[in-house]
Every structure is written in C-alpha cells, then in structure tokens.
C-alpha cells in the first residue's frame, strides 16, 4: 500500500472439501483495526464495493477472493503494508470453525 493508505484488501482462494456448503462470516487481521467481507456491485452504471454478511463456499468447491469480486477489506491499517510484510489472518465460518493463517506474505501491486 502507499505510505499513507488507510485501507487494503486480502485476496485468496478458500477450498471446501466437505459435503455441505459453508460460509465465511468474518475475518480478523492483526494489521488493521477493522476487517470486512466485501463484493463489487454495479449501481447506477458504476462499479462499487459493498459490505456483505458472508461469502458462501459450495460443498466440494472453492471460492476465489479477488480484485473486482469477493474480498476481505482491511480498514484503518495500523501500518503500511509493503512487500514481504507478514500478516496474520483469522477466518471464521458458520460451522463454528476458525482457520488461523500466520505470517502470510504480502505483495505489492
């Protein structure tokens, strides 16, 4: 992110190898004060981000969180994210499971 950026986003792919659909219901990162689930929508001829309550991952499938689609928005960054910044991320699902991702490498855009 640029030195004074207040927000950034996380992109990744979530795999569901179970027999039931699951939903990502929240995310928390150590590098931001707030983390939200977002998607992009078209409204009045413009593409804009919208906060959403969950991201569904179908059974035996995967969902890609990417630019222009579903993503995790990091708001109120505690420090700039530069190349090789390590980020910790907790993903909470509706099946009462949490996945802790530690020391994720960040990338520059």
Where in this protein do the model-derived segments appear?
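Compact, glycine-rich, soluble single-domain proteins
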Residues: 1-109
């Amino acid at each position: 992110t640029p030195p004074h950026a207040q927000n950034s986003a996380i992109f990744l792919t979530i795999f569901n190898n179970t027999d039931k659909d699951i939903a990502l219901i929240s995310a928390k990162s150590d590098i931001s004060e707030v983390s939200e689930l977002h998607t992009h929508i078209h409204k009045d001829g413009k593409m804009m981000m919208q906060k959403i309550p969950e991201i569904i991952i179908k059974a035996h499938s995967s969902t890609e969180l990417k630019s222009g689609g579903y993503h995790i928005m990091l708001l109120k960054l505690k420090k700039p994210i530069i190349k090789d910044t390590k980020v910790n991320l907790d993903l909470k699902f509706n099946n009462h499971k949490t996945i802790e991702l530690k020391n994720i490498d960040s990338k520059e855009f």
